[in-house]
């Protein structure tokens, strides 16, 4: 096994240090399944488990549009899913040559540390969404998009971002 090439593994669970956690899981299973010392050495020497931050809202199976989408793609897909257009994938490591994800049109950031990006995401995006929930519901507005079209809600969010959220970074 030592002669086999390794893998670059991109963990996508939304937990801190997801690459390290996945590596620990793989090591435990390798031990439980008695894959041996050669496998353990190959795993250690040839493979990289990257920590990542994935930011994209995935809304689930598109029940109302599923038939139309399946007809368009020419197959039934019971695992069909929908997602918002915005996406960000922050990956710890330097594998841009091996994985030219940006060339495929993905919004990817290669970095030495995911943590600062997570801090920004949690504070700015999650903070803004949290700040909008109750005022928006009181105004009978159900989506962020609708909230941003309302001048009073947009002004409220702008104030929250500039006065309270951004100064914490």
Where are the regions a protein language model picked out?
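Substrate/ligand-engaging "lid" and interaction regions
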Residues: 1-169
